[in-house]
Amino acid sequence: MKWFEVAIKTVEEAEDAISNILYDLGANGVVIEDDEILKYPNSWDYIDENQFPKRNFAVVRAYFPESVNISELIFNIEERLKDASQYLNIGEGKIDISEVDEKDWANEWKKYYKPVEIGNIVIVPSWESYPNTKDKTVIKLDPGMAFGTGTHESTMLCLEAVQKYIKPGFDVIDIGTGSGILAIAAKKLGANRVLAVDIDDVAVKVARENAALNNVEIEIKQNDLVFGIEEKFDIAIANIIADIIIKLAKDIKNVLKEYGLFISSGIIEDRLDDVIKSFKENLLEVVEVKKLNNWCLVVARK
């Protein structure tokens, strides 16, 4: 069997949005080529950087069965990219199509996904074994088609922050939960009630599976950000993108208790000032800003 490989030339900030678009349109698998992977502290023992010429773009590759109507698919991709470009820098957005031989795209990436430690938390792929240890919080994870493996800088920053700010008994909401990794971490760190929401039904399904895998009780539901949520929480977490965080700044106080914290990440460094400005305009006190490579985390207090 042959597959169509759709390669889109983009920028790092748009990788996740474009990946989601391609999955929505029926991709059986997505691969991201990005120089930022060379910066992951736990991914490599040694790198000869001369073997990796620096590029200022990323490539998202998706794989579709040969039975797909390729003309219709390209049209739909172009339309979705046009829509995405209204709120996100997608870079060049050039689309290349080629035919490739059959491969197990859904499982190939698992060979490269290994346990990763962030502070006292260890993210362990569901198919890997890891020794039980009292001084580490182990989270078993199978991200499937949902964002959040623990290796992305924005997720690392969030995992460091939840360890710093979440106290036993806190109520926590995770907005745009993806794989459920941050909600699961919150529960394992002693949070009382944890609500995880995502607009994507695939993410909701994956998050529920990962919660069951970790034997934690988390309420997970499909929802558009905080729309319609009336409960109050000690901490709100959003690892999304800058534009959505800026949009959230107007409403986040409605779901926070007095002096509650908003932990936000997924912010590219070029958009950091915009996020901080939106927080100040909405009377949120910025209490911490942290950077990892060119990704940023901002913690604000109600």
From Swiss-Prot:
The keyword Cytoplasm applies. It is found in: Cytoplasm. Keywords: Cytoplasm, Methyltransferase, S-adenosyl-L-methionine, Transferase. Its EC number is 2.1.1.-. It is an enzyme of class 2 (transferase). It catalyses: L-lysyl-[protein] + 3 S-adenosyl-L-methionine = N(6),N(6),N(6)-trimethyl-L-lysyl-[protein] + 3 S-adenosyl-L-homocysteine + 3 H(+). GO terms for cellular component: cytoplasm. S-adenosyl-L-methionine binds at residues 155, 176, 198, 239. NCBIfam families: prmA. Belongs to the methyltransferase superfamily. PrmA family. Methylates ribosomal protein L11. This is Ribosomal protein L11 methyltransferase. It comes from Caldicellulosiruptor saccharolyticus (strain ATCC 43494 / DSM 8903 / Tp8T 6331). The lineage of its organism: Bacteria, Bacillati, Bacillota, Bacillota incertae sedis, Caldicellulosiruptorales. The gene is prmA.
